[in-house]
């Protein structure tokens, strides 16, 4: 017996689509969608491949979102088999780069649409796909580019809004469907340089040690409460230092500068602007000279309990018997960009235990189950 989800997942894994190379994955998917009657549009930018595909003319829109790109393989010698030759293992897994993150989700989405539209050729709502080859890398010309175009069109009333979005990121922890992401923390990065006065360590009155200054600043940053108020959905905002650089290499020289990189993972209880202002205030209070380079890599988003989360919990319970955990844990995803469109958004995909690792794999039985979950959500939301 053939398994169409497995076959499509294998076809996608064979394509060496390391960011930002799509390697023809969108053509494979687009061909399948076009046969169903989808209207296809490529919104490529700066060498990144992006696909926007739509079906239907009326009713609420359910969007499937994801990425065709994968992370590098690492040392090929460590793999049990070629990462771009899909391998079915004896214990029932599909192995290959992208098997879990997230070519299996893409295959499940496409096949779910095929089966759904075969049974309901005229659904009560619309379906769309937003796919990119730039999620694992800089993520500056992928989903961002499509969202920017959709924002322009929606402002001009030339494009209908997305009502519900399912991102196929591998959200599950131990069993398919046990965790569904309903939000993600924002991520703010800073490169802070503390300026002092270089000199000989034997003459402290003639130097201003920036290492000491940076240490005081870091201690204050660690001890700061960054949130306006407690949040029922997210943990408190976290601050972490990831790199520190200082010194000339000599033991008798106080350096002129100390630089460190740091990151805030923040919830909807604060904003990047508020964090930046608080840091500037701390520096002023300490009376030090410092320069800062800021980089906001993602705003936080949250889908509160509503139509999509309710439907998702019910479909998972009906098909698997699991009471799913609606979570905001984990890192960032392209959901942070799509959420700007104002839609209800979740992330639902396979078990994430092996993502980005050697011998990445997904349970073959889960491919069928995931397809059925996606199909069940289409039936409940736009059927």
Question: What is the predicted role of each segment?
Answer:
Residues 94-107, 120, 208-211, 361-368:
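Short, conserved micro-motifs enriched in small and acidic residues
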Residues 18, 69, 78, 136, ...:
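Catalytic metal-binding/acid-base residues of hydrolase active sites
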Residues 102-183, 382:
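Acidic/histidine-rich catalytic neighborhood of metal-dependent amide-processing enzymes
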Residues 65-67, 130-132, 165-169, 193-195, ...:
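Short beta-strand segments
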Residues 1-99, 117-124:
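Acidic/His- and Gly-rich active-site-bordering loop/insert found
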């Amino acid at each position: 017996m053939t398994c169409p989800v497995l076959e499509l997942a294998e076809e996608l894994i064979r394509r060496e689509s390391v960011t930002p190379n799509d390697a023809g994955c969108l053509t494979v998917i687009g061909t399948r969608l076009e046969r169903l009657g989808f209207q296809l549009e490529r919104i490529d930018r700066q060498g990144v491949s992006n696909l926007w595909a739509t079906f239907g003319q009326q009713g609420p829109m359910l969007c499937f979102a994801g990425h065709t790109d994968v992370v590098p393989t690492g040392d090929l010698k460590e793999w049990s088999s070629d990462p771009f030759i899909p391998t079915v293992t004896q214990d029932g897994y599909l192995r290959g780069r992208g098997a879990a993150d997230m070519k299996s989700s893409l295959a499940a989405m496409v096949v779910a649409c095929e089966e759904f539209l075969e049974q309901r050729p005229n659904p009560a709502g619309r379906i769309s796909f937003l796919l990119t080859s730039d999620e694992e890398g800089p993520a500056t010309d992928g989903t961002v580019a499509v969202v920017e175009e959709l924002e322009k069109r929606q402002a001009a009333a030339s494009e209908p809004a997305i009502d519900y979005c399912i991102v196929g990121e591998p959200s599950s922890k131990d069993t398919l469907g046990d965790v569904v992401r309903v939000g993600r923390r924002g991520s703010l990065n800073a490169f802070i340089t503390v300026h002092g006065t270089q000199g000989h360590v034997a003459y402290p009155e003639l130097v201003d040690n920036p290492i000491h200054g940076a240490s005081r600043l870091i201690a204050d940053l660690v001890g700061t409460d960054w949130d306006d108020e407690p949040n029922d959905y997210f943990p408190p905002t976290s601050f972490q230092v990831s790199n520190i650089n200082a010194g000339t290499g000599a033991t008798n020289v106080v350096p002129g500068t100390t630089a460190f990189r740091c990151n805030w993972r923040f919830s909807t209880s604060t904003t990047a602007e508020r964090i930046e202002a608080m840091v500037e205030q701390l520096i002023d209070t300490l009376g030090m000279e410092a320069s800062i380079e800021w980089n906001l890599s993602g705003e936080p988003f949250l889908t509160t309990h509503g139509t999509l989360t309710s439907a998702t919990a019910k479909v998972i319970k009906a098909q698997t018997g699991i009471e799913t955990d609606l979570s905001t844990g984990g890192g960032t995803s392209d959901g942070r960009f799509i959420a700007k469109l104002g839609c209800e958004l979740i992330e639902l995909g396979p078990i994430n235990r092996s993502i980005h690792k050697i011998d990445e794999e997904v349970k073959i039985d889960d491919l069928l189950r995931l397809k059925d979950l996606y199909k069940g959500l289409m039936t409940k939301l736009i059927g």
